């Protein structure tokens, strides 16, 4: 009964207005009020501020500054094996496994298709048929910054407008196609292990999605698809320089928690068989072993 009520609320709640108002509040410089609210949040969620590069609360003028805090440089050791792809975010692995043709997994007997997740862009879909995937949910208390599983050269970025349903695991396991219906930013990288997609999923009260090269992508929420292309000859056609991001380097962030999805090509990587749904994910841990495509 509770699950049905939670799903019904996803349709009834004014999600855009809630997200807008929470975003305003999170950006407010409230002085001692903000610091007390942050302290209360830390207490409720038992956050270890020793992991932060700024453990002193006076360093955070707004809730957003706290939510997007950086980790201490030694907080998440990066697996340095060049064949190892690492987990890109702190959170919970909600799904991991193989892609069956274009079917990623099923929710309530309804399949998730690459076509829906990638908004029908066949040139991208083709890279991941029979590939593999991982979905990581980022709770509010975790680090909201997203990192690179391996070194990659940026090829395309797509902003897909959509809804702002909750991506909490209790909702996503009972409500079909949330990731294909929510707004999202799809980043396509060319790597030594074939193509990789890193997809940042929007959700209710996620005030912003940003990347390190474009800055804030959303808001504004104008309801239109935006597409950035980068050439394959190391000449960025939408900017002055090619964009190469190194393994373990930051690539984006959420202002409040959400979900990141990674897609890999067929026979390009072997997922870490020790990882299972609902395992804790930590940045830098081994995610997969890659087969280099270098000749």
Curated annotation (Swiss-Prot):
Pfam families: PS_Dcarbxylase (PF02666)
InterPro entries: PS_Dcarbxylase (IPR003817), PSD-B (IPR033177), PSD_type1_pro (IPR033178)
Modification(s) after translation: Is synthesized initially as an inactive proenzyme. Formation of the active enzyme involves a self-maturation process in which the active site pyruvoyl group is generated from an internal serine residue via an autocatalytic post-translational modification. Two non-identical subunits are generated from the proenzyme in this reaction, and the pyruvate is formed at the N-terminus of the alpha chain, which is derived from the carboxyl end of the proenzyme.
The entry's keywords: Cell membrane, Decarboxylase, Lipid biosynthesis, Lipid metabolism, Lyase, Membrane, Phospholipid biosynthesis, Phospholipid metabolism, Pyruvate, Zymogen
Superkingdom per UniProt: Bacteria
Any one biological process term the GO annotation gives: phosphatidylethanolamine biosynthetic process
Protein family per UniProt: Belongs to the phosphatidylserine decarboxylase family. PSD-B subfamily. Prokaryotic type I sub-subfamily.
Subunit and interaction comment: Heterodimer of a large membrane-associated beta subunit and a small pyruvoyl-containing alpha subunit.
Protein name: Phosphatidylserine decarboxylase proenzyme
Lineage: Bacteria, Pseudomonadati, Pseudomonadota, Gammaproteobacteria, Enterobacterales
Gene: psd
